Amino acid sequence: MALSVEEKAQIVAEYQQAAGDTGSPEVQVALLTANINKLQGHFKANDKDHHSRRGLIRMVNQRRKLLDYLKGKDTTRYSALIGRLGLRR
């Protein structure tokens, strides 16, 4: 269920701010979004998997915290990230 090494490397390369950047909020939110989307597909087939659902809720909360941080720090980067990931309205 987790992202493969290749998928993770592709996401990091796409959202990094500079070479070697793996910890910026953009990269972290993009990785969490990919994991969340993958888990949503899992729940379509396994709707009673409550243990994994708790992990999904934790990921959603972590993503929300990172987005709140980025929104307070730099609204232009926040808006660009939301648009690229297709989150929100």
From Swiss-Prot:
The keyword Magnesium does not apply. GO terms for biological process: translation. SUPFAM superfamilies: S15/NS1 RNA-binding domain. It comes from the Bacteria. GO terms for cellular component: cytosolic small ribosomal subunit. Keywords: Ribonucleoprotein, Ribosomal protein, RNA-binding, rRNA-binding. One of its GO terms (molecular function) is rRNA binding. Belongs to the universal ribosomal protein uS15 family. Part of the 30S ribosomal subunit. Forms a bridge to the 50S subunit in the 70S ribosome, contacting the 23S rRNA. One of the primary rRNA binding proteins, it binds directly to 16S rRNA where it helps nucleate assembly of the platform of the 30S subunit by binding and bridging several RNA helices of the 16S rRNA. This is Small ribosomal subunit protein uS15.
